[in-house]
Amino acid sequence: MTSEFFAKILIILIRLYQILISPLFAPCCRFYPSCSEYAIIAVRKHGLSKGSRLALIRLFKCHPFHPGGYDPVR
């Protein structure tokens, strides 16, 4: 199995989160795009390994003491 296959699985799991779990909470993401959308873009653009790493870094920045704002995938 290739990393491309696992990248697609990860994207499906993130989409399921967006559809099933995210609506249960108030919209409070301090970033644009949202962290889940950022993760999908990062995995599509950089592949599974680097994209996942970028998504994790973004999640660690998501806390009340970070100002948030526009943070595109680079």
From Swiss-Prot:
SMART domains named among the record's database cross-references: Haemolytic
InterPro entries: Membr_insert_effic_factor_YidD
Membrane topology: Peripheral membrane protein
Pfam families registered for this protein in UniProt: YidD
GO cellular component: plasma membrane
Keyword Cell inner membrane belongs to the record: yes
Subcellular location: Cell inner membrane
Keyword Coiled coil in annotation: no
Name this polypeptide is given: Putative membrane protein insertion efficiency factor
